[in-house]
Amino acid sequence: MFKRFNRGQISFEFSIIVLSILLISTITITYFLTSSFDEGTRTLDKIDLGAKTAVSLVNSGYNGTQTEGTLIYAGMTWDNAGNNYENITVYISNTTPVPVNTRLFVKNYTIESQGIDTTKYDFTIAWSG
């Protein structure tokens, strides 16, 4: 009779220990990730992701934004000034001229979809091709 109770008790204690280890691991990883990347780094990542998505949407003809050629996301550069990121430039290569409304769509989509604070992080798009 006591052996059954002991097995159940050990199983319960083991479950509590595993749960505690998982909880501590999750808290540690979350703390590490939030303290490792500052706001500027996260904003650069958002601009990068937003621009890539906007280029992909234009290439698929999203919302009437069509070009005769293909847009290619070519990368991004920036300057560090202390803890600030300045002169952020996104490079997009195009094979044919891109209409003004499509250019505006790419920039506005990047800003709006990623919630970029343009008073702190303004960026330009350099079109080549």
Curated annotation (Swiss-Prot):
Locus of motif QXSXEXXXL: 9-19
Record-linked InterPro entries: Class3_signal_pept_motif
Record PTM: The N-terminus is cleaved by the prepilin peptidase EppA, which recognizes the class III signal sequence.
UniProt KW Secreted keyword: yes
Compartments where located: Secreted; Cell surface; Fimbrium
Top-level division of the source organism's lineage: Archaea
GO-annotated cellular components: cell surface; extracellular region; membrane
A UniProt-annotated Pfam family: Class_IIIsignal
Keywords per UniProt: Fimbrium, Secreted
Disruption phenotype annotation: Deletion of the gene leads to poorly piliated cells.
Domains: entry comment: Contains an amino terminal motif QXSXEXXXL, which is part of a class III signal sequence.
UniProt protein name: Minor structural pilin EpdA
